[in-house]
């Protein structure tokens, strides 16, 4: 049931590229989600982007830091950043990502 939404009730079908950084102490971290041609930007969609909602059986994680990418005046993508300010937020995020990856047949690789 792990899903991502940009507008409540409208599940995003495009699978993002996710980049993670974490402090040396493990207390803070950042997740950057890059969506190429997400469903929310389709011409027929009239919903407003109100944030990025990561929803699973534990609840939801919310970030309001969502930016659009435009090429020649047309929307081409979205970038959302979620900042984790504690080890507990990091662990919660990782649990969500494990569920999301399992449901979408995704893998994880360290760079």
Curated annotation (Swiss-Prot):
Q: Where in the cell is it found?
A: Cellular thylakoid membrane
Q: What are the alphabetically sorted keywords of the record? A: Membrane, Photosynthesis, Photosystem II, Thylakoid
| UniProt main location, coarse | membrane
Q: Which GO terms describe its biological process?
A: photosynthesis
Q: What GO cellular component entries does it have? A: photosystem II oxygen evolving complex; plasma membrane-derived thylakoid membrane
How is this protein situated with respect to the membrane?
Peripheral membrane protein
Q: Does the keyword Acetylation apply?
A: no
Q: Name one Pfam family in it.
A: Psb28
The record, for InterPro entries, names:
Psb28_c1_sf, PSII_Psb28_class-1
Matching entries from Gene3D superfamilies are given as: Photosystem II Psb28
The keyword Thylakoid is assigned to this record? yes
Q: How does it assemble?
A: Part of the photosystem II complex.
PANTHER family in the record? PHOTOSYSTEM II REACTION CENTER PSB28 PROTEIN, CHLOROPLASTIC, PTHR34963
Q: Give the record's family classification.
A: Belongs to the Psb28 family.
Q: What is this protein called?
A: Photosystem II reaction center Psb28 protein
